[in-house]
Swiss-Prot record:
This is Protein argonaute-4. It comes from the Eukaryota. It is found in: Cytoplasm, P-body. Keywords: Cytoplasm, Ribonucleoprotein, RNA-binding, RNA-mediated gene silencing, Translation regulation. The gene is AGO4.
Length: 794
């Protein structure tokens, strides 16, 4: 459009365009405030396409207000100014690369990282404009995502179905093969190869049940009549093409009711299609290996990216037009490393552990409050030839020894130790155990790799019978280690009501001087493209003064009829938060005999654009929960959003301060200046020791604070809570309550799994669970009353 109407309208201007409906110019266009309609012709598939475009002046974006906000003179940063700068800086990359969200990708050149299943890794970069103290910042980071490989459909099918040689596939696909293939290819764009240069593109809507040799469609004859013709016959008559694989199915493309069929062998996957479907575990593992970079390597890669002419640092006419200058150097700033809290253990010695770089050792220490296990059972779902009786006996003996050392003695042999097969045997076996063995405290379940048995064990144990279960992979039974057994004990002790360790009281922040409850909340959504599964909301609350024990509440989020934007917010806001918080406050009072005077609420899973729209209704809901208990009950609320999905990375300016094999910043590194918001209360905290790749600091945004925390107090409190996660002897990347809320929401996904489908992915949701029957959904995630007040999710 700009090229077509250069003389009449645009002249030498270089407008920035957001790809949707907004165009920005540095100076007014010579059209006044009138609407101008124009036509633009672009080359299409087979023929040119003409588009009607209207442009009209909307408003002036003031950069003066933005400068005042950056200097701290205004409380609100004008969003329209930030959006305009973002669009302008993204305009050139959008034309050069394939945009995905806020990142840009280009096809692999000089590297190839296959993920299997027709998918591959594309590398690129993330770019966004962010307000900071005194300046606007350009956030650049290396990025990677999965794309579908441009290849013939026959090859794609072979990858998806693990067919080594297509010539050996002489029979039609089985039903299960066809279903798997359909699931992968539905929604993808393909282009045809049998029409010469005219590579027409189509979107796949289905895969036919019948092969091309038998799949028929009504062919219109010249006399106006129609006759049934097979796809194979049609291609032979029309294109003189004898199909090589007439026994394979066809792709149904376009609209389903139009019956357009294409043989697999005349189709290719169109290049540049991002994979939005969930990666398999193997693909995720391959992706992590392909993308993990040590901190110094990532730093070098980002610097190279910025300085290279091919990316953001090159001559950009759009930046020049608007007078925008981007400095090539990374921002240098001063951070500080917070002191790690000491952790109190129990037993006779009452030992104290001092973390070193986010890690401490439990050897020679006993749990602060260990549980004695007198009645326990073992159910082995791995086949006997894979897990022999002598190996099982050795495992249980070693577990008992380690548990005794840890101060959680497992007394005697298991009362029951039997082999079992398949998810269907879980419920009858567990019912038998509950009836037969009075006071049964724990069932240890041995699993044969990834299996639907896990989901069924958790459904029956957590929701149906109220029994504590601990699953162990068979590989860890056959070849066990003290570390694995010790980690099992951490989980078992917490599940049964024990306390692994506590923060040393005299080192805790002053917020602990009065009763305080820590809440963690999260909402998990189904993978993209899976409209059948519901979103799940979870809220957990601390139940003691340490804080160590937590209780959980969980709900299925029902979707209402809204616009897409309203739906986005309604699915993210926790709908029944008032009742969930009320339950936790009542339970806190029952556990401690105190009413909390402060509520510290850590909220995970909220994106930057949704923060305020989610925070206000949730704050009101928390306040309502308090008032519903007593009219005058008004504890101070602090509402903190915890974000991990961002692209800010911290690197040590001084190489001597790098830590570990990956050269990351030390655990406890905190930044609350220079790159933080000019007027809002936020900070970055890297609370964990990076094991692989570059550590990602968590970003904390304080949206409401009745409790008047100083930045130092809240940073230290948050860091200490990262050391209270029961599953490991390491500080974790987000505070324990926020982490537990995620675990609870993910566990509820397993409670919804349909055991009648052999789903190793846990991907099938039972028939009533597709959003049509909210009552059945609510019942499916309802925890049994015997388990409700335990840390079943640990």
């Amino acid at each position: 459009m700009v090229r077509h109407f250069k003389m009449q309208i645009f002249g030498d201007r270089q407008p920035g365009y957001d790809g949707k409906r907004n165009m920005y110019t540095a100076h007014p266009l010579p059209i006044g405030r009138d609407r101008v309609d124009m036509e633009v012709t672009l080359p299409g598939e087979g023929k040119d396409q003409t588009f009607k475009v209207s442009i009209q002046w909307v408003s002036v974006v003031s950069l003066q207000l933005l400068l005042e906000a950056l200097a701290g003179h205004l409380n609100e940063v004008p969003e329209d100014s930030v959006q305009a700068l973002d669009v302008i800086t993204r305009h050139l990359p959008s034309m050069r690369y394939t945009p995905v969200g806020r990142s840009f990708f280009s096809p692999p050149e000089g590297y190839y990282h296959p993920l299997g299943g027709g998918r591959e890794v594309w590398f690129g970069f993330h770019q966004s404009v962010r307000p900071a103290m005194w300046n606007m910042m350009l956030n650049i980071d290396v990025s990677a995502t999965a794309f579908y490989r441009a290849q013939p459909i026959i090859e794609f099918m072979c990858e998806v179905l693990d067919i080594q040689n297509i010539n050996e596939q002489t029979k039609p696909l089985t039903d299960s093969q066809r279903v798997k293939f359909t699931k992968e290819i539905r929604g993808l764009k393909v282009e045809v190869t049998h029409c010469g240069q005219m590579k027409r593109k189509y979107r796949v809507c289905n895969v036919t049940r019948r092969p091309a040799s038998h799949q028929t469609f009504p062919l219109q004859l010249e006399n106006g009549q129609a006759m049934e013709c097979t796809v194979a016959q049609y291609f032979k008559q029309k294109y003189s093409l004898q199909l090589k694989y007439p026994h394979l199915p066809c792709l149904q493309v376009g609209q389903e009711q139009k019956h357009t069929y294409l043989p697999l062998e005349v189709c290719n996957i169109v290049a540049g299609q991002r994979c939005i479907k969930k990666l398999t575990d193997n693909q995720t593992s391959t992706m992590i290996k392909a993308t993990a970079r040590s901190a110094p390597d990532r730093q070098e890669e980002i610097s190279r990216l910025v300085k290279s002419n091919s990316m953001v640092g090159g001559p950009d006419p759009y930046l020049k037009e608007f007078g925008i200058v981007v400095h090539n150097e990374m921002t240098e700033l001063t951070g500080r490393v917070l002191p790690a809290p000491m952790l109190q253990y129990g037993g006779r010695n009452k030992t104290v552990a001092t973390p070193n770089q986010g890690v401490w050792d439990m050897r020679g220490k006993q749990f602060y409050a260990g549980i004695e296990i007198k009645v326990w059972a073992v159910a082995c779902f791995a086949p006997q030839k894979q897990c022999r009786e002598d190996l099982l006996k050795s495992f249980t003996d070693q577990l008992r020894k380690i548990s005794k050392d840890a101060g959680m003695p497992i007394q005697g042999q298991p009362c029951f130790c039997k082999y079992a097969q398949g998810a269907d045997s879980v419920e009858p076996m567990f019912k038998h155990l509950k009836l037969t063995y009075v006071g049964l405290q724990l069932i240890v379940v041995i699993l044969p790799g990834k299996t639907p048995v896990y989901a069924e064990v958790k459904r029956v144990g957590d929701t149906l019978l109220g029994m504590a279960t601990q699953c162990v992979q068979v590989k860890n039974v056959v070849k066990t280690s003290p570390q694995t057994l010790s980690n099992l004990c951490l989980k078992i002790n917490a599940k049964l009501g024990g306390i692994n360790n506590v923060l040393v009281p005299h080192q805790r922040p002053s917020v602990f001087q009065q009763p305080v409850i820590f809440l963690g909340a999260d909402v998990t959504h189904p993978p993209a493209g899976d409209g059948k599964k519901p979103s799940i909301a979870a809220v957990v609350g601390s139940m003691d003064g340490h804080p160590s024990r937590y209780c959980a509440t969980v709900r299925v989020q029902t979707s209402r009829q809204e616009t897409s934007q309203e739906l986005l917010y309604s699915q993210e806001v926790i709908q029944d938060l008032t009742n969930m918080v009320r339950e936790l406050l009542i339970q806190f009072y029952k556990s401690t005999r105190f009413k909390p005077t402060r509520i510290i609420y850590y909220r995970g899973g909220v994106s930057e654009g949704q923060m305020k729209q989610v925070a206000w209704p949730e704050l009101i809901a928390i306040r309502k929960a308090c008032i519903s208990l007593e009219e005058d009950y008004r504890p101070g609320i602090t509402y903190i959003v915890v974000q991990k999905r961002h692209h800010t990375r911290l690197f040590c300016a001084d190489k001597t301060e790098r830590v570990g094999k990956s050269g990351n910043v030390p655990a406890g590194t905190t930044v609350d200046s220079t790159i933080t918001h000019p007027s809002e209360f936020d900070f970055y905290l890297c609370s964990h020791a990076g094991i692989q790749g570059t550590s990602r600091p968590s970003h904390y945004q304080v949206l409401w604070d009745d409790n008047c925390f100083t930045a130092d107090e809240l940073q230290l409190l948050t860091y200490q809570l990262c050391h209270t996660y029961v599953r490991c002897t390491r500080s974790v990347s987000i505070p324990a309550p926020a982490y537990y809320a995620r675990l609870v929401a993910f566990r509820a996904r397993y409670h919804l799994v349909d055991k009648d489908h052999d789903s190793a992915e846990g991907s099938h949701v039972s028939g009533q669970s597709n959003g049509r029957d909210p009552q059945a959904l609510a019942k499916a995630v309802q925890i049994h009353h015997d388990t409700q007040h335990t840390m079943y999710f640990a």
